[in-house]
Amino acid sequence: MTAPASPTVRRRRLAAELRGIREDKGKSGDSVAAALRWSPSKISRYERARTGLRPQEVARLLDYYQITGPRRALLLGLAEDAAQKGWWEEFAESLSDDYKQFIGFEHEAASMAIWHVDVVTGVLQTEAYARHIISSYSRIEPLPPGMIGRMVGVRLRRQQVLDREDLRLSVVLDESVLKRRIGDKSVMYEQLQRLVRDGDRPNLTLQILPLTAQHTVFGESFVVFGFRDDSDELQQDVVITEQLRSSVTLEGERETYLHRIAFQALSDASLSPPESRALILDTAESYWSRAWQQASA
């Protein structure tokens, strides 16, 4: 199973290329807007990938920039892909723009390096664990009736990426995640058993950073998305860092490089995958299973 094109990723690549063409031509956004009788804000929005352009609008823009040949064909192909809708658009009213963008990156990434400091990362969560996490958000920001169920459904559907043979997923979880209670004890036991099963996937490397480890990477959870290297100049890595109610997207070469170095440092300080598996099993059995059984007795 491989991933089809993500409209989110294509739109961002197209936006970056069109912005680069305008700058190479020495034209301002206002001058392009005036020539095409578009509003300056339209130029700004599509160059920041806030909105998309219809394929015919891209063709008109390329005519103005006098772009022909293979480069034109590539950009028009990106425009066609960007105009498609991802499955997550079915839930558009329930999802923030940041979250839709995140799913779009996840949908097409060739690799993901995930560091989670507080909870199990979303693509590895059980339904019960996810429901408790999402329900907890409503204590900060009340959610409309039915929203929690839809959000859980989206999270579970995201997990289809685990079945992609072309995805390489590396996950480092802080050891505290294994002992931080989410829901009741049975939820935690089942979640840790799920981590053990997912850790056996051939395309997934799961490591635990022990509490005794000495490392220099502190701060929020983050994901580094890597995209296919197919000699396409429009490919670039993306980093997303998580905040309380939103996320921050970083695309600069320096930022993506620093986060890759940070992830490697975390991985180096972590237990090996077999050692991590043993720790997860031990925690599930000694910390949650026995306590669960005693509580149920």
Question: How would you describe each model-predicted region?
Answer:
Residues 1-86:
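Basic, Lys/Arg-rich alpha-helical nucleic-acid-recognition elements, primarily the DNA-binding modules
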Residues 1-2, 11-14, 29-34, 44, ...:
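Short hydrophobic/aromatic-rich motifs at helix boundaries and adjacent loops
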Residues 10, 36-38, 98-99, 172-175:
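A short alpha-helix capping/helix-coil boundary motif
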Residues 34-36, 93-95, 279-281:
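Short secondary-structure junction/hinge motifs that connect adjacent elements
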Residues 46, 64-65, 87-91, 99-102, ...:
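Aromatic side chains
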Residues 111, 115-297:
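Hydrophobic protein-protein interaction segments
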Residues 47, 57, 106-108, 175, ...:
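Acidic-residue sensor for enzyme active/binding pockets
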Residues 76, 83-134:
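Helix-turn-helix/homeodomain-like alpha-helical modules used for DNA recognition
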